[in-house]
UniProtKB/Swiss-Prot annotation:
Plays a role in virus cell tropism, and may be required for efficient virus replication in macrophages. Belongs to the asfivirus MGF 360 family. Induction: Expressed in the early phase of the viral replicative cycle. Keywords: ANK repeat, Early protein. This is Protein MGF 360-19R. The keyword Calcium does not apply. GO terms for biological process: taxis. ANK repeats lie at residues 66-98. It holds the Pfam family ASFV_360. The lineage of its organism: Viruses, Varidnaviria, Bamfordvirae, Nucleocytoviricota, Pokkesviricetes.
Amino acid sequence: MPSTLQVLAKKVLALGEHKENEHISREYYYHILKCCGLWWHEAPIILCFDGSEQMMIKTPIFEEGILLNTALMKAVQENNYELINLFTEWGANINYGLISINTEHARDLCRKLGAKEMLERNEVIQIVFKTLDDITSSNIILCHELFTNNPLLENVNMGEMRMIIHWRMKNLTNLLLNNDSISEILTKFWYGIAVKYNLKDAIQYFYQRFMDFNEWRVTCALSFNNVNDLHKMYITEKVHMNNDEMMNLACSIQDRNLSTIYYCFLLGANINQAMLTSVLNYNIFNLFFCIDLGADAFEEGKTLAKQKGYNEIVEILSLDIIYSPNTDFSSKIEPEHISSLLKNFYPKNLFAFDRCNPGLYYS
């Protein structure tokens, strides 16, 4: 086992990329890194820290950086024994390596470095959960490569898996879990996270490999207010839903989906049906935005709200005399214009309601 001094020296070298050095060329510096085993995928390994002071590994492939434990899992999957040792020396949890073992040699090395015999089912879930903390394209792609077809995920508790999925996917969880295989569920899960957080490199990665999931991509763009990705899919004719189906998703999954609601409205979707969908899903901000766009299905909305026991919405819709369409909107459908128009937007009719009923709805 290398001495503590050797481990420290390698850390200092890996951190050296971020410091100016007039005495050696970049080529010679990279040569030193390669000789010291600080080399991965034909490129130097650079060590850095995130805002929480967690150690991260950067390479040209992982240019956004990946957490040390994630790097260990990838090194184990690749049977890169030198890096398994290196990342463990730097403090990676060797038990994380158990999730991606695919050879007996790698298993023996992990045991030698202190790993337990096997992971419990709840430990597998915890590793997935913690790895998901890092929302970048590099990390979401790695999640797919490490976990999607991993046999350890075949036997996890689906109740615990549902909790992880719901944490990120919210009301899309049931739709996602309707898929037959855990592999398909996980692939769509990572893809959905990429769309939700507009991780462009990850979106492109999944798009190139899973053309059959275009409708899922559109569903996520609508549900998570990603008007840029929605527009990209629409203008390239990758959307195979009608405008009202799209509006239904935009209004139902989460509140404050203003950009995608507005986009569907400009395409010609029925704004009264959008209003009723917002009532049904108790999305009050969406409801007021629909009224701003000209929705006037107040009686139908009240009937639906009474059936659901939504007393606050009944109160909102009973004051229809104070509401009127907002005339400040335009017909420009470009995402940049929509984002600019709706930045810090507050529905005119919600403001009118607030003045009549201060404190009833906390926006």
